[in-house]
Amino acid sequence: MLVGGGVNNASSGIYSIVSGGYNNTTINGCSAILGGQCNTTQHDCSFIVGSGICSTAANTTHVNCLHFSNIPTSSAGLAPGTVWNNGGVLNIA
């Protein structure tokens, strides 16, 4: 359990971390919160990047919004699970 900076942050989950931010809490194991405010991880291996988020599932990264840059325009050679742009429609290889 590690709290690295910020204000009013807490980490009670084993192998969990809160890095910066305000009023963030990790409850379950192997979870992390990176900055933001008013976040809670309540599932094992859950991760939060953003603000005002409570985890909803284990083994999941939770965010408010994602921004993609330089998305491949073909699935050729991509690993399974990779996002690619198919004429303006996002696909998963």
Give names to the regions the model predicted.
Residues 1-77:
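Periodic small-residue-enriched repeat registers in elongated scaffold domains
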Residues 56-57, 85-93:
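Short, surface-exposed terminal/edge motifs of secreted or surface/virion proteins that either
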